[in-house]
Amino acid sequence: MTQAFEIHGSSSVSTTTAIEFLLDETGSMMHVWDQTIGGFNEYVNSQRAQPGTCLLSLTKFDTSGVRNSYSDSNIQEVAYLDRNSYRPNQSTNLYDAIGQRIKALEARVTAGAYPSDTAFLFVIMTDGQDNASKEYDASGVKVMIEDKKTSGWTFVFLGANQDAWQVGQTFGMAKGNTMTYAAGNVAGAMETLSGATTAYRGMRSKGMVASASASENFFADASTPSAAPVDAGNVFAAVMPNPGMGHRYTTKKAK
């Protein structure tokens, strides 16, 4: 169960959540092109239905660049992804994308772009490990993430077809904030992410903020999605907690 405590010393409670969403647009995502578009759009829809203000920033990345589609847009007004705005290509510059976007968000915070008690949620979704970064490496990104955790930022990592905890720990991700999923079950992963995001925002709307320990257990209160087919045959993917390895989508034969 998520732990929380009340916000004191303020006559009003901010219900603003700023979500920085970092989405892999590399060539391997071509296999789940439409699923990724649909899953992201459903995530947007689900968060539109929640109370409070949600500011969404979307950045896509591959070796051609780290491209920010929009920053701090009211989630009620953002454009959906489609095959024109999301076009997978090239290799994975994951660390460069994380480092650049932390710097960009940090600059906006320093400039006073947000209420002082805004909740910052930094979501990273990829189906591959870094193989093309030039500006940042895992150790450099880890230092940046650890620093921002002390300021109350929450970092979440979703990795397809990999051990998300094993990969994520190399650059500072907490076990409870990582999730492994089958690439063919993007919808299930997005559903779980949305449930956890809703719980996170719900605490804010009640005048609560996550404790230090709870901020590293992001998926604790997320709903478990229904089984959804992965790419091949009659194999199905379901989300299951995996002690010591964050949350994991494991596959099993349908009965």
Where are the language model's segments positioned?
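Acidic, low-complexity intrinsically disordered regions
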Residues: 1-255
